[in-house]
Amino acid sequence: MMNNKPDQTDEFELYDLKVVVESIEGNCTCNMTEGDHFFLKGGKLSFPCEQDFCLYALQSAIPLLPAKQRQCHPADWIETDSRCVCPDPACRLTMRIDRIAKRQLKHDDVSPVSWDDVNCKV
């Protein structure tokens, strides 16, 4: 009997990220300072103890983070570009997204859809 199931593993890699305030060239009304940062590990954000982070700066980085967690084609802009800015034009805050480590994850640990169910349909 032939097995038509593809030989696929349920494991995948994501980069852990550190998002760092690289520069502030204007007036930051949220009192951010160069070096302020947060981490993204798997699907969880973490902030250093007692450190605040501007909501508006955070929201400008968030759409980029899932793509930066994944290895893309070397020519893809997400592989070469690592900066984003706060949307407040008076602030002129620039953040840098650094890949700091790779994390191994399993599909069933991060999804309510069973890998076995998905893999049977392929």
Each language-model region and where it sits:
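Short, compact, well-ordered microdomains
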Residues: 72-121
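Preference for bulky hydrophobic residues occupying beta-strand positions
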Residues: 19-21, 97
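Short alpha-helix capping/helix-loop boundary micro-motifs
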Residues: 22-27
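Structural beta-strand/beta-sheet cores of well-ordered domains, especially the beta-sheet scaffolds
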Residues: 15-17, 36, 93
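Short, basic/aromatic beta-hairpin or loop at an interaction surface
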Residues: 6-19
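Helix-coil modules at protein/domain termini and other flexible surface or pore-lining loops
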Residues: 10-13, 43, 87-88, 100
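Acidic, aromatic-enriched beta-alpha/helix-loop junctions
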Residues: 36-76
